[in-house]
Curated annotation (Swiss-Prot):
Biological process annotations from GO: mismatch repair
Biased composition (Low complexity): 367-381
MF GO annotations: ATP binding; ATP hydrolysis activity; ATP-dependent DNA damage sensor activity; mismatched DNA binding
Keyword Repeat set for record: no
SMART domains, per the entry: DNA_mis_repair, MutL_C
Role this protein plays: This protein is involved in the repair of mismatches in DNA. It is required for dam-dependent methyl-directed DNA mismatch repair. May act as a 'molecular matchmaker', a protein that promotes the formation of a stable complex between two or more DNA-binding proteins in an ATP-dependent manner without itself being part of a final effector complex.
Family matches, as SUPFAM superfamilies: ATPase domain of HSP90 chaperone/DNA topoisomerase II/histidine kinase, DNA mismatch repair protein MutL, Ribosomal protein S5 domain 2-like
This protein's name: DNA mismatch repair protein MutL
S-S pairs: none
Length: 618
């Protein structure tokens, strides 16, 4: 058989094999088109489980007459126009395949009118070449799609359809999922002329609770724990059922949405299951309704024919974020149980801490960098301080079990800061001849050394060594402990018996250094670290610190601070002039003894006299 171009109808029927699995698939695609059109009311009429009729009517923006024929063509869409649009898609549909595919396996009629048009127009495709016919019609502003005799021309597909009741149950489930995703839209579902479901648009929390109860049932509502969790561009909200009271009936309630799109994602399910594993039996599953919002550039929705799955660019970050959000609400279950009217508003923001594995590279700053980043802590007499990031609008969540009262007070103190941190106070440049000044930075040599001029002499200063001394000063407690910075996602590590014993022995000293942890039989969970360690890869640093402690017989805060200062990774592989000047200003302020008596390896005088002599000519 020679190579040939397939007829349009056959090509669309092949595509329909992926897009149109059953009547519920048709309903999903068409209702999502209505939502993309801005509809606030969608009526779904079904006959004989969708095999005879599927009618979707909405009050959206409608389709212009000249675009009706294109709407039924393959790969024609108003959702995207370039690859950039595809990589940051926010609409539910975008491929332009649904209407063409559905039209190829049914008798489809599209009727629409825009607000600018005086009359409506109707379009339908027929024949081998799928020629589109357009004619006038009567219709209000919006769109109606009628799908008659689904799979009438593909008997093999029609043979695999289930009973009328089964197919309608699948449609009912799709509408339930959409109703949970869009509380602001009225959805009416009818079957064989009878109204079966009516979900009115709601806005208030109490009304949302009633819709949640209508869809998921009263037992779920009674056990639901509200979640509101945020970190950078990630937001998690919704409800999870208390695992201690989860029944077999509740385990069927597993609804997850990514940027408003219904999902069945294994990564998300695994994170939720892992957070609940200590409270669930071997044969139990968590029950949840969760909404994940993420930067559209960081998620690929074009990885599944039916768009049931997505791929996250930073999957580990998303997994740990969801895990910690669910785990935190389970630990606070006595305070956050529904009904919603009886609980305090959930916090809109949480402190922006970095995850243990590193920084969030795609977080978009909400304000200028100088205002967003916490200022360098001011130290007086060796005592440390500093603030811990953005303010939580609703305050820090209730202390997790195992935390002591004073630890909760530290958390609250960290959050009682302005929503926008004040800009760091400018550090006055050091004056030449000052008794506590290294001098003036002339240039950077070799990427990690600063060439200094002071009192007529030239010296070379090692910036990594100066940074290490500064870290040690920042980590050494004075009259009060170093301020701890809570981690958004605590670091959980498996430890040996010797390592656990060493940690317990050094726990009070580590607390003075701002390192807070909890331990159980075989694991230790790092809950907070001092500010200088916020940007470090804690998954490497903390195990090395535990190994160091296990080898020691006695402990001292100075020795531990020295070890940490030597083993932290520099944030500046290549130093700039501005970074060097800022570092020296901090060192002069916090470590004045280094100016008076520089330790070995910090400063090296440069003898220019011999070089100058060589340049002199008789």
């Amino acid at each position: 058989m020679p190579i040939q171009v397939l007829p349009p109808q056959l090509a669309n029927q092949i595509a329909a094999g992926e897009v149109v699995e059953r009547p519920a698939s048709v309903v999903k695609e068409l209702v999502e088109n209505s939502l993309d059109a801005g509809a606030t009311r969608v009526d779904i009429d079904i006959e004989r489980g969708g095999a005879k009729l599927i009618r979707i009517r909405d009050n959206g923006c409608g389709i212009k007459k000249e675009e009706l024929a294109l709407a039924l063509a393959r790969h024609a869409t108003s959702k995207i126009a370039s690859l950039d649009d595809l990589e940051a898609i926010i609409s539910l549909g975008f491929r332009g395949e649904a209407l063409a595919s559905i039209s190829s396996v049914s008798r489809l009629t599209l009727t629409s009118r825009t607000a600018e048009q005086a009359e409506a127009w109707q379009a339908y495709a027929e024949g081998r070449d799928m020629d589109v016919t357009v004619k006038p019609a009567a219709h209000p502003v919006g769109t109606t799609l009628e799908v008659l005799d689904l799979f009438y021309n593909t008997p093999a597909r029609r043979k695999f359809m289930r009973t009328e009741k089964t197919e309608f149950n699948h449609i009912d489930e799709i509408i339930r999922r959409i109703a949970l995703a869009r509380f602001d839209v009225t959805l009416n579902l009818s079957h064989n002329g009878k109204l079966v479901r009516q979900y009115r648009a709601v806005a208030k929390d109490g009304q949302k609770e009633r819709r949640l109860g209508a869809i998921c049932g009263t037992p779920f509502l009674e056990q639901a724990l509200a979640i509101e969790w945020q970190h950078g561009d990630l937001t998690l909200r919704g409800w999870v059922a208390d695992p201690n009271h989860t029944t077999t009936a509740l385990t069927e309630i597993q609804y997850c949405y990514v940027n408003g799109r219904m999902m069945r994602d294994r990564l998300i399910n695994h994170a939720i299951r892992q957070a609940c594993e200590d409270k669930l039996g071997a044969d139990q599953q968590p029950a949840f309704v969760l909404y994940l919002e993420i930067d559209p550039h960081q998620v690929d929705v074009n990885v599944h024919p039916a768009k049931h799955e997505v791929r996250f660019h930073q999957s580990r970050l998303v997994h740990d974020f969801i895990y910690q959000g669910v785990l935190s609400v389970l630990q606070q279950q006595t305070e956050t149980t529904l009904p919603l009217e009886e609980i305090a508003p959930a916090p809109r923001h949480v402190p922006e801490n970095r995850i243990a594995a590193g920084r969030n590279h795609f977080a978009v700053p909400a304000e200028p960098t100088a205002a967003r980043e916490p200022a360098t802590p001011r130290y007086s007499g060796g005592a440390s301080g500093g603030n811990g990031g953005r303010q939580s609008a609703g305050g820090w969540p209730h202390a997790q079990p195992g935390y002591q009262k004073q630890q909760g007070e530290v958390y609250r103190a960290l959050l009682q800061t302005p929503a926008t941190s004040p800009a760091p106070e400018p550090v006055a440049p050091a004056l030449d001849g000052h008794s506590q000044s290294f001098g003036r930075v002339l240039t950077i040599v070799g990427g990690d050394c600063a060439l200094l001029e002071h009192a007529g002499t030239i010296q070379l200063l090692s910036l990594p060594v100066a940074e290490r001394w500064l870290r040690q000063a920042q980590l050494t407690p004075g009259q009060s402990p170093v301020c701890a910075q809570p981690l958004l996602i605590p670091l959980r590590l498996k430890v040996s018996a010797d390592e656990k014993a060493a940690l317990q022995k050094a726990q009070s000293l580590l607390g003075e250094l701002g390192i807070e942890f909890q331990s159980d039989a075989q694991h230790v969970t790092i809950r907070a670290v001092p500010l200088p360690l916020r940007q470090q890869n804690l998954q490497i640093l903390i195990p090395e610190l535990i190994g160091y402690l296990a080898q020691q017989t006695t402990f001292a805060t100075v020795n531990i601070a020295q070890w940490i200062a030597r083993n932290v990774q520099s944030e500046h592989p290549q130093w700039s002039m501005a970074q060097a000047i800022s570092l020296l200003a901090d060192v002069e302020r916090l470590c004045p003894q280094l100016v008076k008596a520089p330790p070995g390896g910090l400063l090296q005088p440069v003898d220019l006299h011999s070089a100058m002599s060589a340049l002199k000519h008789e």
